[in-house]
Each structure stands twice: as structure tokens, then as C-alpha cells.
């Protein structure tokens, strides 16, 4: 039988966008250990942060940077190419410390910096609340391109997250592989979640930053159009069937007496008999 830690870890890793603190609060309430269980959940917090491309603020900075498996160093240290900084992450609190200067050592440094500049322009145009990163991976034989955008509206009972992860082998390859993840949670008087993943294989004519980001932007635009079409079909199909239908009585309404009905009184300002 799974232990309390295993159950609680699954709750952490399945937390909806922007609701991790709520899940942690519920875990403390539901388990007999209370606050004492949280330190034992550190591995689950780390997996959640890396897979969800959690964003954190560096000490003394306002811009958020990404935490992922692609920019992990030793232990709980990560690096950000754009700010040339490495930093320690407390995965439970999503706070940072011990920031240090970091110099990117990669034979593909020029391409990475060019990709960062072009990706930044793309992100600012299409994803206002976003963070992004470009990192050397696989012993410098490939490049990872990451983008995450969060929109939280708890007052309106919804939160959402967009993530895109691409990998581009440096060399003779002209194909980018990647995935787009969209997660939305709506919870007013119910609980509706959208979790969708789109695998991608994108051909590029050359390995320039402009070509790579242009093809990525096109693929993202096409997927957004696919989602919009799917939403329209769902609204007229599955969702429509969930709406409560008014009963059909086949009785005629006596319009001359409508003022005596409750609805008629409401409409006429209570002037019915």
C-alpha cells in the first residue's frame, strides 16, 4: 500500500497551475503529520518545478527565470544564460539564494545568444506574461529552447499555463522536436480541467536563429487555431449536452394572465395581481 508521502507527492506533482500553495495547505490539513510532512516531499516539489518550468526571481531582481532539467547544475543549483547567473533554488518555497556570476561555456554560445534575442522578441509579442530560456544540452550537441506563460485569475476561479519545450540537434539536422503543453483549471461551482499536449516535428531550412524561431512561431500559431476549433466543437457538442434543459410541458401560455405568474411579476416590477 502506498505511503502517505507517496500519496502526498502525487498531489504535489498534479497541482494545477498557480495552485501549488493551495495543494500544500490541503496536504497539511488532511494528513496527521501536518507541517512535518512537507520536508519529506522535497523530491516531489523538485519534479513539479522542473516539469512545469517553474519561474523564480533572482535575489535583487524583478525578472523571473526558468527552473528546468535543462539548466540544472550540481545539487539544487541552476543557471540562466541571459542574466549570466547561477543560483540555488529552494524547491519547497520556490525561492532563490546564493546567486553567482555564470559564464556560458559552449561551442554554440553565439547561436544560443542569438536564439535568446529572437525568442525574447517572439515571447514579448505573443506571450506578455512569459519567461524563456535557451540552454546547451546533451554534452553541447543540442540546444533546448523553453517558453512558459502563466495566467492566474483566482478571483474568477481559473488559472492557466502554457509550456513549450523544443530541442534542436546542432550539426546536420534540420528538424526541431518538441512539445506544447496547455493546462487550464476552472473551478467555479465545479471542477473542469484542460490538459493537452501536442508533439511537434518542425523542419527548418537552416540553423539560423531567425529561421528556427520563425518556424516555432508558425507551429504554435497553428496549434492555437486547432485548439480554438476544438473549443468551438466542444461548445456545440459535449458541453452543450451538459447544460440543463428546460422541461417541455406542451402547455399553452395564457399571455393575458402572464402578470399573475411569478415570472411575470418579476418582469413587470411586481405589478401583477
Swiss-Prot record:
Localization: Cytoplasm, Cytoskeleton
GO MF entries: actin filament binding
UniProt entry keywords in alphabetical sequence: Actin capping, Actin-binding, Cytoplasm, Cytoskeleton
GO cellular component, one term: F-actin capping protein complex
Keyword Cytoplasm: yes
One biological process term in Gene Ontology: barbed-end actin filament capping
Main localization (coarse): cytoplasm
InterPro entries with a match to the protein in the record: CapZ_alpha, CapZ_alpha/beta, CapZ_alpha/beta_2, CapZ_alpha_1, F-actin_cap_asu_CS
Pfam families from the UniProt entry: F-actin_cap_A
Listed PROSITE patterns: F_ACTIN_CAPPING_A_1 (PS00748), F_ACTIN_CAPPING_A_2 (PS00749)
Record-stated family: Belongs to the F-actin-capping protein alpha subunit family.
Subunit structure: Heterodimer of an alpha and a beta subunit.
Function: F-actin-capping proteins bind in a Ca(2+)-independent manner to the fast growing ends of actin filaments (barbed end) thereby blocking the exchange of subunits at these ends. Unlike other capping proteins (such as gelsolin and severin), these proteins do not sever actin filaments.
Designated name of the protein: F-actin-capping protein subunit alpha
Source organism of the structure: Emericella nidulans (strain FGSC A4 / ATCC 38163 / CBS 112.46 / NRRL 194 / M139) (Aspergillus nidulans)
Taxonomic lineage: Eukaryota, Fungi, Dikarya, Ascomycota, Pezizomycotina
Gene: cap1
Amino acid at each position: 500500500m502506498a505511503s502517505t508521502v507517496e500519496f502526498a507527492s502525487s498531489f504535489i506533482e498534479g497541482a494545477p497551475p498557480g495552485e501549488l500553495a493551495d495543494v500544500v495547505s490541503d496536504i497539511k490539513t488532511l494528513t496527521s503529520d501536518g507541517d512535518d510532512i512537507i520536508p519529506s516531499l522535497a523530491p516531489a516539489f523538485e519534479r513539479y518545478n522542473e516539469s512545469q518550468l517553474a519561474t523564480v526571481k533572482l535575489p535583487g531582481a524583478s525578472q523571473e527565470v526558468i527552473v528546468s532539467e535543462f539548466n540544472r547544475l550540481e545539487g539544487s543549483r541552476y543557471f540562466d544564460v541571459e542574466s549570466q547567473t547561477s543560483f540555488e533554488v529552494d524547491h519547497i518555497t520556490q525561492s532563490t539564494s546564493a546567486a553567482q556570476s555564470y559564464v556560458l561555456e559552449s561551442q554554440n554560445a553565439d547561436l544560443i545568444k542569438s536564439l535568446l534575442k529572437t525568442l525574447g522578441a517572439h515571447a514579448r509579442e505573443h506571450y506578455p506574461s512569459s519567461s524563456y530560456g535557451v540552454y546547451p544540452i546533451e554534452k553541447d550537441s543540442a540546444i533546448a529552447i523553453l517558453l512558459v506563460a502563466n495566467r492566474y485569475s483566482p478571483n474568477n476561479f481559473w488559472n492557466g499555463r502554457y509550456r513549450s519545450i523544443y530541442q534542436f540537434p546542432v550539426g546536420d539536422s534540420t528538424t526541431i522536436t518538441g512539445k506544447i503543453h496547455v493546462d487550464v483549471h476552472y473551478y467555479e461551482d465545479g471542477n473542469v480541467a484542460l490538459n493537452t499536449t501536442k508533439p511537434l516535428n518542425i523542419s527548418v531550412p537552416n540553423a539560423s536563429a531567425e529561421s528556427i524561431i520563425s518556424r516555432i512561431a508558425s507551429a504554435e500559431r497553428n496549434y492555437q487555431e486547432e485548439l480554438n476549433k476544438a473549443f468551438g466543437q466542444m461548445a456545440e457538442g459535449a458541453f452543450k449536452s451538459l447544460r440543463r434543459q428546460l422541461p417541455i410541458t406542451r402547455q399553452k401560455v395564457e399571455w393575458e394572465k402572464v402578470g399573475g405568474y411569478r415570472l411575470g411579476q418579476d418582469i413587470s416590477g411586481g405589478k401583477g395581481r
